[in-house]
Amino acid sequence: MKLEDYIATIENYPKEGVTFRDISPLMADGNAYSYAIREIVQYATDKKIDMIVGPEARGFIVGCPVAFELGIGFAPVRKPGKLPRKVISVDYEKEYGVDTLCMHADAIKPGQRVLIVDDLLATGGTVKATIEMIERLGGVVAGCAFLIELDGLNGREAIEGYDAKVLMNFPG
């Protein structure tokens, strides 16, 4: 299946000069969505994963069904103020400033093998911050899986040394 056919391209969104890749059409098509999830599940199967971690919000959309299919748990990564219990956090550089991500301090147990799942790999800031939190909690990042990688934005540099699966590539 050619998943690229299920990605909408919106020019100048969310701001002038940005090309947005919208996964909504992929999610709206049961066959395409299921195919994408199965591809990530297949990637994860040999890695002996204990936990899926997904950054908000689209990491939930992709990561939760993967966790369900694997019969394992899911841990969310969120912006400050969105998680009710004790959290750990990481500040990370974005294109125009600094942002913060958080996860529950008890989300990952030492030694757990974790797969990070998100919709998009661009500059790698989000995944790098997520890796930092998982490793701070004693987890082992066994891999990263993305629906889309935007080429030319150096996201791979952020995950250098980590195994990664990307289902589609688009110009960045």
From Swiss-Prot:
Keyword Cytoplasm applies: yes
GO biological process, one term: adenine salvage
Entry annotated with the keyword ATP-binding: no
Biological pathway: Purine metabolism; AMP biosynthesis via salvage pathway; AMP from adenine: step 1/1
PANTHER family: ADENINE PHOSPHORIBOSYLTRANSFERASE
Subunit comment: Homodimer.
UniProt record similarity statement: Belongs to the purine/pyrimidine phosphoribosyltransferase family.
UniProt name for this protein: Adenine phosphoribosyltransferase
Name of the coding gene: apt
